[in-house]
């Protein structure tokens, strides 16, 4: 295990509106406000999204299992933002549900907001963290 100690810096409250791309808006906010490290919490609803719901098996590098929906679902998620060499990289795990059906996984690609998504972002100050491709794991991993 590797770790660093930091403090909570700025706090952002964002409202992502109907039809907006949730991931693109969060990434844009990280660029605009230069959020280099942060924790985020999201809740609301999304009309469509793609999620990686786990690896096909426990191999390294993992083979992702993709799920996509377009029927509008509630969303509750948490994630982080750290930069790679050029831009912020979001890592958000969420549960989306409708009726008795739910999916849990890592949000990827375009995620269209339905009605509204509220996001709270807590900036982490005083740490030196980034994301970079881990050649062994085959994923962009947290680097401390």
Question: Regions from the language model: what does each represent?
Answer:
Residues 1-90, 95-144:
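N-terminal intrinsically disordered, cationic/polar leader segments
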